[in-house]
């Protein structure tokens, strides 16, 4: 098995590599087992698709697309496009996980955007589960509900 991590932030990539070393101190991973790409996620997914790369498990966890309420519509369009790109590189029977930390994107609208993206990729899906805040992260106001995610089996 192998991991390909894509991030445009070099600090995030360095932290990930450091974390890998902390958890697997006695294991040296080859470039085939663990690799990183410092690039925009949309660009990377487009290239991977054109290179005919397909994966068993794809995680889409971008930074917040809507930091202001007026960015909500653009954010939903971006989540749809990201899910479409992710679905195109997920193998049939593979798992696609899409997440959002955008406070201004309502949970139901996020899920609709993800599902629309999967369909626009010409793929079907079976929803496995939805995620949100853990019990140790209590919600006392609607704006606090910003973490959301969905696992889908791509068909």
State where each predicted segment sits.
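A structural alpha-helix within SAM-dependent methyltransferase catalytic domains
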Residues: 49, 80-87, 115
């Amino acid at each position: 098995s192998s991991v390909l991590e894509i991030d445009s932030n070099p600090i995030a990539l360095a932290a990930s590599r450091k974390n890998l070393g902390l958890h697997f101190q006695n294991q040296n991973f080859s470039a085939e087992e663990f690799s990183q790409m410092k690039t925009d996620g949309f660009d990377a997914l487009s290239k991977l698709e054109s290179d005919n790369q397909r994966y068993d498990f794809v995680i889409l966890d971008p930074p917040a697309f809507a930091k202001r309420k007026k960015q909500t519509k653009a954010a939903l369009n971006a989540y749809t496009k990201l899910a479409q790109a992710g679905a195109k590189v997920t193998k049939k029977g593979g798992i696609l996980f899409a997440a959002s930390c955008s406070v201004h994107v309502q949970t139901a609208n996020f899920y609709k955007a993800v599902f629309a993206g999967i369909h626009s990729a010409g793929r079907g899906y079976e929803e496995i589960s939805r995620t949100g805040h853990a019990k140790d992260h209590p919600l006392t106001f609607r704006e606090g509900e910003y973490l959301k995610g969905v696992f889908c089996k791509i068909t």
